[in-house]
């Protein structure tokens, strides 16, 4: 098609021929293109018009006007047919048979085929139809298929889309609600942590105040004593060089009294006892605290800042020894009410009888049920007796403690 278009193109305007005219030299040009050349030739020749020369071969032509030139009807018809072919859609070709147009419709396989496919290919003995009939039939089928597809799209896809969007919206709402709960939880947790931190720091401030109240009076006493010592030293410095006996004796008496008062004033202890809380406090013991128990964080309990408690009181140790002695004393008397040997003998007889029945296969099932019930009843009685013995022993111990006021 491209080569044909080159032959149908005017050399002057480089477009398809429009009303082509042929020169005596057999070259073709558009009518409008030749008119333009003739007008230019007339303007350039003022006195006498020069002969017209062919733009292609430069051969002179004695034509006086374009209308006198012959119309090339054959070329004009070819150009018109070419324009129609160029405007019409391009026919597809067969992929199996190169260059063969798909101009037949196979009704059996519902597809376009070429002539080779219909006669010698895989579509032999199939039902065929013309392109026009197939177009009409497939057009009706398209309308039905399109309507059913539209119904399916609206009935299934759109409904699922609505469902997905609804579920998405609900899921986002739930996530937002849960995130708000998480935010509220951590805000409460942070509030609890801040509150607990302030409580513990407040306890430290209270202990600091107690330490100041304990140490400040002793420090003030020592400062007063040091002040008295400085005054005594100043008195000694003032009269050590006095040579008058009366004045020296007076100053000596005052110095001796000052020294006596200083020596009689007791000095406060320098190693005041420290609270166990202040010695043993360590935040590493809080590392095992869980978040749910964060409200239970507290400082170790201490009755006073400057008092310490021994881990074992002598009275508690004595009480433990007494309770152990009571158990040793009252235990045998309690167990006299119940004989374990008799109970074991009864169990031995039951097991011996049960063993004798093991050799009798016929009675084994029936007797095993009976002895199993006997065993469970015996265990229940045994547990009840142990419980009663324990209660009696504890009751005797409690009466002894209350009687002698050990607690």
From Swiss-Prot:
Residues 172-200 form a coiled coil. One of its GO terms (biological process) is protein autoubiquitination. Auto-ubiquitinated; requires the RING-type zinc finger. Auto-polyubiquitination leads to proteasomal degradation. InterPro entries: TRIM/RBCC (IPR050143), Znf-RING_euk (IPR027370), Znf_B-box (IPR000315), Znf_RING (IPR001841), Znf_RING/FYVE/PHD (IPR013083), Znf_RING_CS (IPR017907). It catalyses: S-ubiquitinyl-[E2 ubiquitin-conjugating enzyme]-L-cysteine + [acceptor protein]-L-lysine = [E2 ubiquitin-conjugating enzyme]-L-cysteine + N(6)-ubiquitinyl-[acceptor protein]-L-lysine. Keywords: Coiled coil, Endoplasmic reticulum, Immunity, Innate immunity, Membrane, Metal-binding, Transferase, Transmembrane, Transmembrane helix, Ubl conjugation, Ubl conjugation pathway, Zinc, Zinc-finger. It holds the Pfam family zf-B_box. Its main location: endoplasmic reticulum. A zinc finger (RING-type) spans 10-58. The coiled-coil domain is required for the induction of autophagy during endoplasmic reticulum (ER) stress. This is E3 ubiquitin-protein ligase TRIM13. It comes from Rattus norvegicus.
